[in-house]
Amino acid sequence: MNDENRRAGAADLLAPLHPSDPLPPFVRASGASYFTADGREFVDLNEMRVVLGQGNEAFTQAVTDALHAITAPKNVHVPSKEHLISLLDWATDGAFAAIHLTSSGSEAVESAVRLAQKLTGRSEILSFWNSIHGRTYLSSSMSGKSQRKAGYGALAPGVVFLPYPDCLSCPMKRAGGCGFACLEMASRIYETASAQDACAVIVEPYQGSGVIVPPEGYLKKLQDWAKARGMLFIVDEIQSGMGRTGRLFRYQQEGLEPDLLLTGKALGNGMHIAAVLSRKPLAKEHLHVFAGGSGDDAVACAAACEVFRQLDSGLLAHVQSVSRTLQEGLTALEANEHVLTCRSCGLAAAIVLRNAPTCERVHHALTQRGFLPGRQENVLFLKPPYVVTNEQILAFLAALRQELST
């Protein structure tokens, strides 16, 4: 095969992975920016994993040092793992009796559900419309989005979906000030569409798909609702945890007491690691659900420890500062005739436009101007790396205002 055919073949193989707006090749990167061979800069505004930014020398050194040590120890003490466990314990105020490391968020979700089933002796799991919990069989079955399930065969049994409090699209047309009518609807669904045998309810403290933020007090009411029915309360912070909201975990801002807490993505800064934290201590017979796996890989643990170190050394305060800049800009943007609403939770935001064609046009124009937000239908979404600067956010907002005025 000659070089031209080889390049064409590679393009065909990668076609499903290419964005709708093809980007030029990048030759280097730094912080939240990518650069082309001719010096053009593109600011990444949609990166949930590599939160410490590109070219982070301290992170690279921490991982390199770990690679030079024992990388896959068996039945021995691993300093990076022990340190990470202590950091997770510290970050959650010592509220959890057991911590298990996994190699992905999907694995963490499935492990948590299996553990909840074992602890309660029940089988069903309650999830939410529009939720995202992973790509594996059970975790995708638990995700409330048709794109994750339609056409892929039979789903895992025992999953019951409840309405998430998306006030903009309230199915009862009672947005705001309704006393959480969607929770009343959840009660009816549970009574009529399930065997009333739920081991747990699993919820994202804000939904990663669309950055839908529940009204204040809803999550606490949901927790009380679940516990009154004998269910465990699982908080999935795989997207929201490890600093995205300006706090290490959003459940702390809401005053929640989850039975099981999940975290991942930002935890490893691109390395494959996630965690399940259990409030209840685990007996020996519970440990089989966690047997095997590679979540406690020494290199991934070292990576996560470095994420904690940088968050504690000023990066978390930086996230809070940039989040305020973003929130102020989004509040002003809501006056634009093309904008239906803006939603945000720390450094996660969604700009909901009135129609999809406008959103597609604006997204394309922003890409050409060197900004890389995400897009889904009529929503632009922002989940930048934590090192994004106030200046980069302000430049993006200025470009967005200009494109919305044309």
What are these model-predicted stretches?
Residues M1-T406:
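Conserved N-terminal phosphate-binding loop of PLP-dependent enzymes in the Aspartate aminotransferase
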